[in-house]
Amino acid sequence: MIDLFSPKGKKDTVSTTNKDKSFEDGIVNIINKIKAGDKLLREEFINSYTPYIIRTVSNLTGKYVDVENSDEFSVGLAAFNEAIDSFDEGKNMFFFKFSTLVIKRRLTDYARHNKKHCHVYPFTYFEDKNNSYFEQIHLKSEIDLQNTYEISREIELYEQKLRDFGISLEHLAKCAPKHKDSKSLCIKIAKVIADNKELFSKLERTRNIPKTELLKLLKINKKTIERNRTFIIAAALIFGNDFNLLKDFLDISEPGGDNIERSTK
């Protein structure tokens, strides 16, 4: 039997072979008990996988991690705890791959926040081979993360949503706004739609952007919506359906761009 709290067990989580299924099932069982309110088990689980958190943070930042004094470690620890609460076995079969992405996302947010004040570490630490998470806003079907079970499963669900709107991933990549500020603005518009239950419901029901209602809420040019319809819909579907892993393919926290002014009507 594999000890779920042992370093050996932890290493086994990176494998997707059948022999690791019992380990993964055991982890899911632990996560479910923690989410059901077992605080002692949560503490034990986090303490047992602190070495995993340290290694993940170190690999992502390219820095030595001092547990006592590292802000990055604190971010990683909080992200691991967040991953426990947000893990959905229906979407993500492997917890540790999911938690790695959550840690990466939170370190990314931390780096962006601190870059406003000082150079904490270069963004290249977060690049994935030839594709940067910061520079590539639209979906890239060829990147390595899509080979994992979790991202593949989420992409499958996402593609079905897109098909309902007559959109393919290939078409989406071609339609993504080229200008940085335009992309940023479209993402903000998409978030407004996704965060508004009435707007998002109408989007899914009519298979189109509710322009009339949206223009009453925001002071934006109608042509901006029309020119970027495909990208705005695609982004709204990610936000509205809580596709957490796919959010890493959208630079949703990118600073700059046009600020959306709310209508006072």
From Swiss-Prot:
Q: Which Gene3D superfamilies match?
A: 1.10.1740.10
Keyword Methyltransferase tagged: no
**Polymerase core binding, short sequence motif: residues:** 71-84
Q: Any idea which GO molecular function terms this record carries? A: DNA binding; sigma factor activity
Q: How is its activity regulated?
A: Negatively regulated by the anti-sigma-I factor RsgI2. Binding of the polysaccharide substrate to RsgI2 may lead to the release and activation of SigI2.
Is Ribonucleoprotein one of the keywords? no
Q: Which residues bind DNA?
A: 211-230
Q: Which SUPFAM superfamilies match?
A: Sigma2 domain of RNA polymerase sigma factors (SSF88946)
Q: Which GO terms describe its biological process?
A: DNA-templated transcription initiation
In the induction comment, the record states:
Up-regulated in the presence of cellulose.
List UniProt keywords, sorted A-Z: Cytoplasm, DNA-binding, Sigma factor, Transcription, Transcription regulation
Q: Which GO terms describe its cellular component?
A: cytoplasm
What subcellular locations does the record give? Cytoplasm
InterPro entries for the chain? RNA_pol_sigma-I, RNA_pol_sigma_r2
- Can you tell me which family this protein belongs to? Belongs to the sigma-70 factor family. SigI subfamily.
State the oligomer form and interacting partners: Interacts with RsgI2.
NCBIfam families tied to this protein: PRK08311.2-1, spore_sigI
Q: What does this protein do?
A: Sigma factors are initiation factors that promote the attachment of RNA polymerase to specific initiation sites and are then released. This sigma factor is involved in regulation of cellulosomal genes via an external polysaccharide-sensing mechanism.
- The protein here is known as RNA polymerase sigma factor SigI2
